[in-house]
Regions:
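Phosphate-ester processing/binding pockets and catalytic centers
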Residues: 1-257
Length: 257
């Protein structure tokens, strides 16, 4: 699991912050053979590092701590992204994503503060999105390990509680829940599977923010679920894109800046 964007909304005086992301996403890639995926992506990056064509490219320098240590769509140059997307299109995964829009997040936070006096923290936002995400994941597949990309310090217990909340909600609605989940955290540089998730989120972000379809078109068959929480034009719970209702640019509600 990885995230895209940030949860920053207000400054210390409660004013909307400028220059923050317009979207916040959390994505999960369900990978049946993670060791195979790690080997393929690590091998591809090693090919890049050994290729003299990339000598002198800033992101390849050790002190830059970018492509030299991991694949990261935002930092990788176009030639790298092209090859990575080609490889990812051949890897069978199932990806689920929940999207929040910053304008609506601010409105929700202000409403909660006005009615309760509670300030919404980054962790509360993150955990709520995780809970929403796992309501759309099958919980009948046996034991599984969920690995989160860690940004600061691990919050494994809190994240497991957020997932357990999803399972409890599903059980209360009569759904069968048998999966036992173990949660761990890792820096993306240490696990190529997290780098894969980053690329999927980047492609989705480019679709929403830049109206670019070429990246998502390479990967869209692997998106099982995309929940756009704040697009309530058709459904109160948000717009749900699935394999039967695939995401397309024309279907997306424009993002407010």
């Amino acid at each position: 699991m990885d995230e895209s964007g940030d949860t920053d909304m207000f400054d210390k005086k409660g004013r909307p912050l400028p220059n923050v992301s317009n979207l916040f996403m959390i994505g999960l890639a369900i990978i049946d053979d993670p060791e195979d995926v790690r080997a393929k992506l690590d091998n591809l990056r090693n090919q890049f590092l050994a290729d003299p064509y990339f000598t002198g490219v800033p992101s390849f320098q050790d002190d830059a701590k970018k492509t030299a240590i991991m694949l990261h769509a935002k930092d990788d140059i176009p030639e790298i992204r092209w090859k990575v997307f080609d490889l990812l299109s051949t890897i069978p995964v199932k990806v689920a994503v929940v999207i929040r829009r910053k304008e609506d997040m601010r409105r929700d936070a202000q409403s909660i503060f006005q009615s309760t006096g509670q300030k919404i923290t980054d962790n509360i936002i993150y955990d709520n999105v995780v809970t929403m995400l796992f309501r759309y994941i099958s919980h009948t597949k046996g034991d599984c390990e969920i690995k989160f990309a860690v940004k600061k310090k691990p919050r494994n217990a809190a994240l497991l509680a957020a997932i357990n909340s999803s399972q409890a909600s599903l059980k209360s609605k009569g759904n069968r829940v048998t999966t036992r989940i173990k949660v761990s955290s890792e820096h993306s540089r240490n696990d190529a599977c997290l780098q894969l998730t980053d690329y999927y989120l980047w492609a989705l972000n480019r679709l929403y923010i830049n109206q670019e379809t070429r990246y998502i078109d390479k990967l869209k068959d692997n998106f099982n679920v995309i929940l756009d929480v704040d697009d309530i034009r058709n459904m109160k719970g948000g717009e749900l894109f699935t394999r039967h209702n695939p995401i397309e640019l024309i279907k997306i509600m424009p993002v407010s800046s």
